[in-house]
């Protein structure tokens, strides 16, 4: 069995919000596997999904460059050693110049970047000179570029603190619609920076993942219901336990069954059949909303729009399609956050945690 260290317990606790001993037991039961321990805690209703932000440790900046014709959008991340340098004007200029260089030369990898020429010298030498001037080690960690296809459009957004950047691409059915969609795409990028969706739509979700998340969702709701029953607060009724977690699970047969059940309810209520067609669509939409909580949490199209939280991003786009007179299909988005995926530095907390175990 893997050794369960105090640092492992602390990381799991910070990521899930679960209790110290619950985290230790979960790690023991899963032989030290962090992701399995998270899932186990969630299935027991003891913790929330681990957030990527909980593991961020690096300093630096994310930069975004969108071409003047909105056909190319590049996002890059350059790491520094301290937050102080990340606010340095020369470092900020370096990130912008590097991103523009990547885009104008259609570079595809960090290796290709280091071999390229900027201002008459190899980029590798240029970066070394910047390191010598700024006084800290600097690393171009990653970058990506999205290109617009025929009748396509791209845009981007960089959060004011430079720690989060987003680029997005959409396919439209005319250049006119593509041009009209520029501001919409920037606003959707702002939404992505705020809400951090992990997927574009429910269609991108893996069914096994959905099924596991459903178990965790039910456990979480049942745990909350248990507490609400104990408190007996009339202003906090029990949660309704959904049958499903995502539209990925809602087959035509399931939707048809839901529709038939709605018809039976309308008949029992004595509603005349001539008005059923006006009632059923709204009730079906409510059924879908109740049974797609995972989509509203993890998928861009299923999330409620930050600028109008009564509508999903999908609904906002549909409205804009009618306004612009054409189709708008989000093809891809990329969101970078400084330090995402890097391990935290080890601090002197092990003894403190060990004393509590």
Curated annotation (Swiss-Prot):
GO CC annotation terms, alphabetical: cytoplasm
Gene of this entry: tsf
Pfam families membership: EF_TS (PF00889)
Species of provenance: Campylobacter jejuni subsp. jejuni serotype O:23/36 (strain 81-176)
Region (Involved in Mg(2+) ion dislocation from EF-Tu): 82-85
Residues of the signal peptide: none
Location in the cell: Cytoplasm
Family membership noted in the UniProt record: Belongs to the EF-Ts family.
Its job: Associates with the EF-Tu.GDP complex and induces the exchange of GDP to GTP. It remains bound to the aminoacyl-tRNA.EF-Tu.GTP complex up to the GTP hydrolysis stage on the ribosome.
Name recorded for this polypeptide: Elongation factor Ts
Superkingdom of origin organism: Bacteria
Keywords assigned by UniProt, alphabetized: Cytoplasm, Elongation factor, Protein biosynthesis
A Gene Ontology molecular function term of the record: translation elongation factor activity
């Amino acid at each position: 069995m893997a050794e369960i260290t105090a640092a492992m317990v602390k990381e799991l606790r910070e990521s899930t919000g679960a209790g110290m001993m619950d985290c230790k037991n979960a790690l023991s039961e899963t032989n030290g596997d962090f992701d399995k321990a998270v899932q186990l805690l969630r299935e027991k209703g003891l913790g929330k999904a681990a957030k990527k932000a909980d593991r961020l440790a690096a300093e630096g900046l994310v930069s975004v460059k969108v071409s003047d014709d909105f056909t190319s959008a590049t996002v890059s991340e350059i790491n520094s050693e301290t937050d102080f340098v990340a606010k340095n004007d020369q470092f900020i200029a370096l990130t912008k110049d590097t991103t523009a260089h990547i885009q104008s030369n259609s570079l595809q990898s960090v290796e290709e970047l280091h071999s390229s020429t900027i201002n008459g010298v190899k980029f590798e030498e240029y970066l070394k000179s910047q390191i010598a001037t700024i006084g800290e080690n600097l690393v171009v960690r990653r970058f990506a570029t999205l290109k617009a296809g025929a009748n396509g459009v791209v845009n981007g957004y960089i959060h004011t603190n430079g720690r989060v950047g987003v680029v997005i691409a959409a396919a439209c059915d005319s250049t006119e619609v593509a041009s009209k969609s520029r501001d919409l795409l920037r606003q959707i990028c702002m939404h992505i920076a705020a809400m951090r969706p992990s997927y574009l739509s429910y269609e991108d979700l893996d069914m096994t993942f959905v099924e596991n998340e459903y178990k965790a969702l039910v456990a979480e709701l049942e745990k909350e219901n248990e507490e609400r029953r104990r408190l007996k607060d009339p202003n906090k009724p029990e949660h309704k336990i959904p049958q499903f977690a995502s539209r990925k699970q809602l087959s035509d047969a399931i939707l048809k069954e839901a529709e038939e059940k709605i018809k039976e309810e309308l008949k029992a209520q004595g509603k005349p059949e001539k008005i059923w067609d006006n009632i059923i669509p709204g009730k079906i939409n409510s059924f879908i909303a109740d049974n797609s909580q995972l989509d509203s949490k993890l998928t861009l199209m299923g999330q409620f729009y930050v600028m109008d939280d009564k509508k999903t991003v999908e609904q906002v786009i549909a409205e804009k399609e009618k306004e612009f007179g054409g189709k708008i299909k989000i093809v891809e988005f990329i969101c970078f956050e400084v330090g995402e995926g890097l391990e935290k530095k080890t601090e002197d907390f092990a003894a403190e945690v060990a004393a509590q175990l």
